């Protein structure tokens, strides 16, 4: 079997003789940016960082911009792939774990931390097999599938919000230092005159529902004294501009905002989605918000995130449906004319902030880095990074047994067996250290 890992060609860092910390993160900015924030802290302390991601994913474009070497695995997500592909999941996972083990043996990380994403699962399991200290950081209140699995094996489970895992350490989600350094809400908002400044954040891809609902709601209010700055993503820019023009609402429509600290400092109120990183920034900046969770988010995790701020009276939650524009109009009618309420929400958000999250995560990583139980690989493993014939026979027998059980089963029964098979694959790996060192069989 061929190696499913691609090693970075980035030149070694001057501190390459020091064992690095390996970050597992990818797929979305919500996983990648917290990892980058922690990488920045570690690098400032003289600790080298290496990254494991997925071929062709967002991290392959973002991470090299920060001079961090990134290795990749040929892997995609397991959710929503249909029954045929689901049936082959155990074999694909086992191959990916072997490939990840190949990378880990080359990099020899002092510790490994998962922020989530496609490559994090195989990378985390390989770390567990090879004895590298494994940590998990879950950004959302509803944990992702990868971090759910890895939390069972991790030394420490860190979270952005309380209540995600039993035995968690709620350290917060990392935010940019310039956002955390903004003045307190009272220093920014008290005594302001002029239009109410509304910041609309659609995320890097934009949010069509916000492009439509915000102009419609503001137009229905009869052109209030409002100044709008709307970040909409490049693909939806023209659509957003047309929507504001048709509603006769003046707005600055921007595909991307480079200086988010300045944008938050300018804003009296924010209308946005409820991704974990965005909410961490709202709290760090200290600004009230109207949150419209992405309805199709996995496990509805954005609603769970939003409920945390709503429970502290730091935000208003509006669900995405056909009546959104009408309900947004009603909420804005109150908030735009009530500066005391906006200040109260901003102060409540600030009390939830954890501006030192990146520093705390780095501290915990380094605490665990000296407590690994790594065992040196056997001579034959060092030579070939291979898998023994006896172990290969066990895996083949297990797969053939499961395949035989699928015949004549209902869809539900097949899915049930598949989940059990996947669990057995993980258990088999954990019971046989060194099995998935990576490479060719």
Swiss-Prot record:
Q: What subcellular compartments does it reside in?
A: Cell inner membrane
- Enzyme class label: transferase
Q: How does it sit in the membrane?
A: Peripheral membrane protein
Q: Which Pfam families match?
A: Glyco_tran_28_C, Glyco_transf_28
Binding-site residues, UDP-N-acetyl-alpha-D-glucosamine: 28-30, 140, 176, 204, 257, 302
Give the EC number: 2.4.1.227
> Which Gene Ontology BP terms does the record give?
carbohydrate metabolic process; cell division; cell wall organization; lipid glycosylation; peptidoglycan biosynthetic process; regulation of cell shape
* Cited InterPro entries: GlcNAc_MurG (IPR006009), Glyco_trans_28_C (IPR007235), GlycoTrans_28_N (IPR004276)
Going by the UniProt record, its keywords in alphabetical order are: Cell cycle, Cell division, Cell inner membrane, Cell membrane, Cell shape, Cell wall biogenesis/degradation, Glycosyltransferase, Membrane, Peptidoglycan synthesis, Transferase
State whether keyword Metal-binding applies.
Answer: no
Record bears the keyword Lipid biosynthesis: no
Q: GO terms for molecular function, please?
A: UDP-N-acetyl-D-glucosamine:N-acetylmuramoyl-L-alanyl-D-glutamyl-meso-2,6-diaminopimelyl-D-alanyl-D-alanine-diphosphoundecaprenol 4-beta-N-acetylglucosaminlytransferase activity; undecaprenyldiphospho-muramoylpentapeptide beta-N-acetylglucosaminyltransferase activity
Tell me the Gene3D superfamilies matching this sequence: Glycogen Phosphorylase B
Report the function annotation for this chain. Answer: Cell wall formation. Catalyzes the transfer of a GlcNAc subunit on undecaprenyl-pyrophosphoryl-MurNAc-pentapeptide (lipid intermediate I) to form undecaprenyl-pyrophosphoryl-MurNAc-(pentapeptide)GlcNAc (lipid intermediate II).
| Name of the protein in question | UDP-N-acetylglucosamine--N-acetylmuramyl-(pentapeptide) pyrophosphoryl-undecaprenol N-acetylglucosamine transferase
Organism of this sequence:
Xanthomonas oryzae pv. oryzae (strain MAFF 311018)
- The UniProt gene name for this protein comes to murG
